[in-house]
Amino acid sequence: MSFLSALFRRSAPSFGGGYDADVSKLPPLGHDGPKTLMAIMAHPDDIDFGSAGSIAKWCAEGWTVYYVLATSGDKGTHDPAFTPQELAATREEEQREAARVLGVKEVFFLGYPDGFLEPTHELREQLVRLFRTYHPEVVLTWDGFRPSFNHADHRKIGIAVRDALFPATRDRLYFAQHDAEGLGEWRVNEILLVGSPDPNYFVDASPFIEKKADAILAHASQVQSHDRDELIKQMRSRGRRPGGRGLVESFKRVHMRSSQRAQRAEEAQRQDGVTQPDESPGAPDAPQSAREPIESPR
């Protein structure tokens, strides 16, 4: 059994592959002002197993990043010493520490029961409220339409996020009470889908591999070994294969209409005679090693 297989208390996740993948930069949003990303997943640790290297990179580049977890992972253990309430409190604290390590600004927990998440009207309203309040240009979430077998909560949060983004966040009369509260409509520019079977967007997060290891190990209730050096060694060894890199994380990039902030900046640039260069979204023909599903143990 490999170290990575032995590290986790239940099933071992993938950390992303992409040894030969072309590496993409996060697409420019057409402005030089604040850039905000909101990562939304079902359980504490879901974001970090698949995307912690990229999150650390974007935070270091000046992005404001928020985490949103639909549940607190209150069923994710085999340890009989935990009650659901104790486990939820533990995992919330672990997630806050992992987010601190990476530079995430704030973590939100929506409090839904682990294992029973549904894309309800209530959940959609909460997500729309977050989008209209914090104005992310980019949203990162699970690919809810991935065809292979995976956790039901992962599928449900991916679907819920898409339904909240379009058309509900854009159109004022969805959840019209927000308008009365001063929360206007909002348009998100990009969606990055984790765990997609056909990723087209690859981030070289090699300089942040140690931060990713620290974020993973912050989820202490979910790992059975805390050997940081060995974890880093194993993650690096995956990238030393021919043509490889130390840490590449893969996403399916979906472009939506430009956000209001980007539209305003793009219009100003057009008036000044400035145009944005066209950039490739990545490597659609990346090898299978870049397409491995990324899923946390819980």
Predicted regions and their residues:
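Active-site rim/loop-helix segments in enzyme catalytic domains that contact anionic ligands
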Residues: 1-134, 270-272, 288
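Metal-dependent de-N-acetylase/amidase catalytic core
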Residues: 2-38, 118-298
